[in-house]
């Protein structure tokens, strides 16, 4: 069953959290759900170059809180926070309420090559540049291993290398225990648009097991997480709507 069900949905409330955190009546629930979907599509379309890994949305009364996990926070923040103001205006326009209070938090992803969505995005970019899929997968696996992941599985489907007949190829390195509920599995999908058609990409990343409140992450011997020298993870919290 663990191989059929969505890895994130299976672990909600155990090792994964909901992407939308709010409660609503049955009457307003569909409207708010569609609103969340529009916000996410707007952010990924407009800021695709910022390496956005995840978008978390929370609601408190009439306030909307959006948390962005990104590999390049500087692209979102901009000079003196101008990017935040532009993003807020875009979200207000997307929801159709220019007076909506929007609070934005930008969080930098610590280990870029250990993030499933960013890995899938990297693979899609390489495939769209017509790089051979086997070479692309091998490079992605090497990047993830250097980042210190415990296991990785990558699957690519479609007309690989322009073949006449579509097929599915996959590879796995290390452990990816899909049946273990306490396993911290990061899962993402991505679509690559090529001249031969679209290719579907799926990435599973095993980061360790969560026992109690702490994640037991055992880095492989010699593994060194890929981080830019001299920089620490940053979190930019937007407080312009307070007071």
UniProtKB/Swiss-Prot annotation:
SUPFAM superfamilies: Prokaryotic type KH domain (KH-domain type II), Ribosomal protein S3 C-terminal domain. GO terms for molecular function: mRNA binding; rRNA binding; structural constituent of ribosome. Pfam families: KH_2, Ribosomal_S3_C. Keywords: Ribonucleoprotein, Ribosomal protein, RNA-binding, rRNA-binding. The keyword rRNA-binding applies. Coiled coil: none annotated. Residues 217-243 are annotated as: Disordered. Residues 234-243 have a biased composition (Basic and acidic residues). GO terms for biological process: translation. Residues 39-110 form the KH type-2 domain. Gene3D superfamilies: 3.30.300.20, Ribosomal protein S3, C-terminal domain (3.30.1140.32). GO terms for cellular component: cytosolic small ribosomal subunit. The keyword RNA-binding applies. It comes from the Bacteria. PANTHER family: 30S/40S RIBOSOMAL PROTEIN S3, SMALL RIBOSOMAL SUBUNIT PROTEIN US3C. NCBIfam families: rpsC_bact. Belongs to the universal ribosomal protein uS3 family. Part of the 30S ribosomal subunit. Forms a tight complex with proteins S10 and S14. Binds the lower part of the 30S subunit head. Binds mRNA in the 70S ribosome, positioning it for translation. This is Small ribosomal subunit protein uS3. It comes from Synechococcus sp. (strain WH7803).
């Amino acid at each position: 069953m663990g191989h059929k069900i969505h890895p994130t949905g299976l672990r909600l409330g155990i090792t994964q959290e909901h992407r939308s955190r709010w409660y609503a009546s049955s009457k307003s629930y569909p409207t708010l759900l569609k609103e969340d979907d529009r916000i996410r599509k707007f952010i990924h379309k407009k800021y695709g170059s910022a390496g956005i890994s995840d978008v978390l949305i929370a609601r408190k009364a009439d306030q909307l809180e959006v948390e962005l996990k990104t590999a390049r926070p500087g692209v979102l923040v901009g000079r003196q926070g101008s990017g935040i103001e532009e993003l807020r205006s875009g979200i207000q326009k997307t929801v159709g309420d220019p007076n909506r209070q929007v609070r934005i938090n930008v969080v930098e992803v610590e280990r870029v090559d250990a993030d499933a969505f960013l890995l899938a995005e990297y693979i899609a970019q390489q495939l769209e540049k017509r790089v051979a899929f086997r070479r692309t997968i091998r490079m992605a696996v090497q990047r993830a291993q250097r980042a210190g992941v415990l296991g990785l599985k990558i699957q690519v489907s479609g007309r690989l290398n322009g073949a006449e007949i579509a097929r599915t190829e996959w590879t796995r390195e290390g452990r990816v225990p899909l049946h273990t509920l306490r396993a911290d599995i990061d899962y993402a999908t991505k679509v690559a648009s090529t001249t031969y058609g679209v290719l579907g990409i799926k990435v599973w990343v095993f980061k360790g097991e969560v026992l109690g409140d702490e994640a037991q992450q055992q880095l492989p011997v010699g593994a060194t997480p890929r981080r830019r020298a001299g920089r620490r993870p940053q979190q930019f919290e937007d407080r312009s709507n307070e007071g």
